[in-house]
């Protein structure tokens, strides 16, 4: 409520009916966002394997001898021959070998990094009541 006041143009009194309005604002929070991400990774692995192989060798030898006794010769895989009783001998040998075979298995581990993007949407609203109404009574104008 207002009280009386004086002015250069006259005396006036403000009436007692003063209505103030109230203003309310409401705001709704934004809704949650969705995000997608992609990542790439590299990994290293180690493996162990075992293999087996077999080989065989054969040898032949020939010998000749001179003297009172005949010569003998033996052959080994490396192909050597000896002679006895004044005899000399030579020998030749051959080796055959099959290649070994093996198998192995390994395991690997990797790490990756990714990026994620997020978007968020929201809405806001506000409302208010009608403005102030003022009733005045002017006297002695």
From Swiss-Prot:
Region: 32 X 2 AA approximate tandem repeats of G-T, residue numbers: 30-94
Sequence repeats: 30-31, 33-34, 35-36, 37-38, 39-40, 41-42, 43-44, 45-46, 47-48, 49-50, 51-52, 53-54, 55-56, 57-58, 59-60, 61-62, 63-64, 65-66, 67-68, 69-70, 71-72, 73-74, 75-76, 77-78, 79-80, 81-82, 83-84, 85-86, 87-88, 89-90, 91-92, 93-94
Comp. bias intervals (Low complexity): 69-85, 114-129
Positions of the UniProt region annotated as Disordered: 1-141
Record's signal peptide: none
Record's comment describing the protein's domains: The run of Gly-Thr is implicated in the maintenance of circadian period at different temperatures. Deletion of the repeat leads to a shortening of the courtship song cycle period, and thus could be important for determining features of species-specific mating behavior.
Protein name per its UniProtKB record: Period circadian protein
Species whose genome carries this gene: Drosophila serrata
Gene designation per UniProt: per
